[in-house]
Amino acid sequence: MIIDDVIIGKGIGDIEFSRENTIFVLIAGTTEVSLRSGITAAGASPEFTRITPTVDAEIIGEGKCLSTADPPMTPEGIPTPAIVSRAILDLTGLRSLIVNGGFSVRPKTAFFETYIEPSRDPGLDRAVMEAERVMEAGRRLGKILDGNFKNIILGESFPGGTTTAYVVLRSLGIDSGTSSSMPVDPDNLKKKVAEESFRRRNVRSPLEAATEYGDNLMIFMIGLAESIRSSKMILGGGTQMANAANLIAKVNGRTDQVVATTQWVFSHRSDLFRILGLEDRSIISVMDFGRMRNNGLRLYNQGHVREGVGMGALYSYARIAGFSREEIESAIDDFYTTFLR
């Protein structure tokens, strides 16, 4: 299959997407590292990042914000990628499921309850206090989903997750940067978190690293991959999901994971995908928001946001399922225009 704005890695083979054989699963939660100033733009302020996953879940589940008056935005007023993802879900009719990955505030929409607590700041404390419980939640959801869908697209909403991914990768000897929701990556802040984390406790095994330095998403994904054997897992996200794929390979011994992301992430951190051996197992959505009517969406082209809430994976899903670029862009623009009224 040749689609000019979707690049499918040569190690993936044929992909068949339809709303009958695919489900989108959003794992959403918080990590206290997002409260550090300058770490993430996934919220108008560090404190607001506590509620970003909550409102992202509400946008995916209900099509509107219920816990706040406005959607999560960067400090510059650029909207959450949940806007893009929900618009594509509406356009394609794809089913979705929201998972509690450690909400600070539970959303006002239906979700798969895990009773997982928010992840902690690894520079101050063990990041995942009940790792086995988180992993078991992943295993249980995997057993429910496996075999019922040909494709399971997994998205995330974890503000600060590229920082925890950076720390875990560094602990495993991978000296490469992770992406960011900001045009200029806060590399020095990420390095500071890593140094503080390693001073607190120094571990080297992949599972210990994810527990000490990571977040619930990483542990949950390891558990999920343990149970999902018949369905194809498509990790919809950027360097957070690249890190998850690496952990799954090291802990579960599986190297069949597909990572689907945007060209904004891939062009920013292609070295990490190469180092992790993911270039041939990646789907890259070459998205261009330059024609959008809304300025906040056009600014995605300037390196803001880049990825999140499965945006890149859902774009590639829609294109492979037969929707045109113009249909997708119009749906996104129309949804956001209506959303702002």
Curated annotation (Swiss-Prot):
CDD domains: DMB-PRT_CobT
Family annotation (Gene3D superfamilies): 3.40.50.10210
Lineage top rank: taxon: Archaea
InterPro entries to which the protein is assigned, alphabetical: Nict_dMeBzImd_PRibTrfase (IPR003200), Nict_dMeBzImd_PRibTrfase_arc (IPR002805), Nict_dMeBzImd_PRibTrfase_sf (IPR036087)
Gene Ontology molecular function, alphabetical: nicotinate-nucleotide-dimethylbenzimidazole phosphoribosyltransferase activity
PANTHER family documented for this protein: PTHR38811, UPF0284 PROTEIN SLL1500
Family the UniProt entry places it in: Belongs to the UPF0284 family.
Alphabetized NCBIfam families for the sequence: PRK04447.1-5
Protein name: UPF0284 protein Ta0078
